[in-house]
């Protein structure tokens, strides 16, 4: 009991850095500032909601920059996705400025902080913080949040022909959704049934889009991939006729993913010989782009906004494929 923490708003987070931030706020002078380097998850994941509420209610003007761990790390030997926040004690101004997700190669590390760019970022639509880095991202976000979360379309009797199939592990830059069962058994394989009046293939196409990758990147910690993250994606399902092109693209994506899949065996001491499959989704990039072009009609994005979405993170997602 001597090491027990009592009376902290952030107790439910069970995280020492959350307690440290709350205590630091208590010790701050009205005109003082504070800055720390902490994991991205502090601003992104639902498990840190009490800390996020503290940031939004108890601090003043805030600057948050975000740094991925690949291809290079913020500090050598520290393989973590990190955020740096600088803020004041609460006052009449409670504006939040953010960067996008910063990635860089080792040889450009010395220019990293000189090139940081912040934008005033809307943070009223969700308890966590979104990582927006430019005005065009803010414009896209403000259109995107007008739509319905996919979780509203979940339910009904188990129907394997109208379900979403996905994995909650692996994938890296390329998270994959299928219209039918995976070709191998894995504890991370999951499926969710969609209501019968909604065509699951339309949702699958939307989840396989570049827009979904942007949504996932700006909202979460880029490590965990949980159901609440997936089904929080906002997409307004209208009717089958108006979404016919998206449904056809979903079939094309399914064929492409399975055609380009790599099958191999893993022999481990604990589990023995197992068959597994990797879906080379980067080879389906043209279909992804076509899906985003169709989604533009749903979200009413401009051509400039569509171009941003299609090319979001492309330098690091495609890598050498861009040079082929």
Task: Label the predicted regions.
Residues 1-159, 177, 183-188, 223-226:
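Signature of N6-adenine DNA methyltransferases within the class I
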Residues 23-31, 40, 54, 58, ...:
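Generic, well-ordered alpha-helical scaffold segments in large soluble proteins
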Residues 37, 65-67, 87-88, 167-169, ...:
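Generic beta-strand/beta-sheet core signal
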Residues 84-88, 193, 234:
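Short, well-ordered beta-strand micro-motif
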Residues 95-96, 174-178, 201-202, 308:
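Short helix/loop capping segments that flank catalytic or ligand/cofactor-binding pockets
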Residues 113-152, 162, 239-324:
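Non-catalytic DNA-recognition/assembly elements of restriction-modification systems
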Residues 147-184, 190-199, 209-211:
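Polyanion-binding interface signature
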Residues 191-232, 239-259:
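Basic, amphipathic alpha-helical recognition segments used for DNA target recognition
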């Amino acid at each position: 009991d001597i090491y027990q923490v009592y009376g902290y708003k952030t107790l439910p987070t069970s995280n020492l850095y959350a307690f440290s931030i709350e205590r630091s706020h208590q010790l701050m002078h009205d005109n003082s500032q504070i800055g720390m380097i902490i994991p991205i998850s502090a601003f992104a994941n639902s498990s840190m909601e009490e800390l996020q509420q503290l940031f939004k209610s108890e601090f003043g003007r805030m600057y948050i920059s975000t740094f991925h761990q690949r291809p290079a790390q913020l500090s050598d030997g520290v393989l973590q996705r990190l955020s740096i926040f600088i803020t004041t004690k609460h006052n009449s101004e409670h504006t939040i400025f953010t960067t996008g997700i910063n990635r860089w190669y080792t040889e450009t590390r010395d220019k990293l902080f000189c090139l940081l760019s912040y934008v005033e970022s809307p943070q009223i639509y969700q308890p966590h913080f979104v990582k927006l880095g430019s005005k065009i991202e803010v414009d896209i976000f403000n259109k995107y949040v007008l739509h319905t979360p996919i979780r509203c379309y979940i339910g009904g009797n188990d129907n394997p022909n109208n379900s979403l199939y996905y994995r909650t592990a692996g994938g890296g830059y390329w998270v994959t959704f299928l219209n039918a069962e995976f070709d191998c058994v894995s504890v991370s394989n999951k499926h969710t049934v969609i209501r019968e009046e909604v065509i699951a293939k339309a949702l699958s196409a939307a989840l396989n889009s570049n827009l979904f990758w942007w949504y996932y990147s700006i909202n979460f910690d880029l490590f965990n991939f949980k159901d609440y993250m997936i089904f929080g994606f906002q997409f307004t399902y209208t009717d089958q006729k108006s979404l016919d092109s998206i449904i056809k693209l979903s079939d094309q994506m399914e064929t492409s993913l399975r055609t380009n899949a790599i099958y191999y065996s893993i022999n481990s001491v604990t589990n023995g010989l197992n068959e597994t499959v990797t879906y080379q989704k980067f080879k389906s990039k043209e279909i992804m782009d076509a899906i985003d072009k169709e989604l533009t009609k749903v979200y009413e994005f401009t051509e400039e906004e569509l171009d941003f979405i299609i090319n979001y993170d492309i330098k690091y997602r495609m890598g050498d494929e861009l040079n082929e």
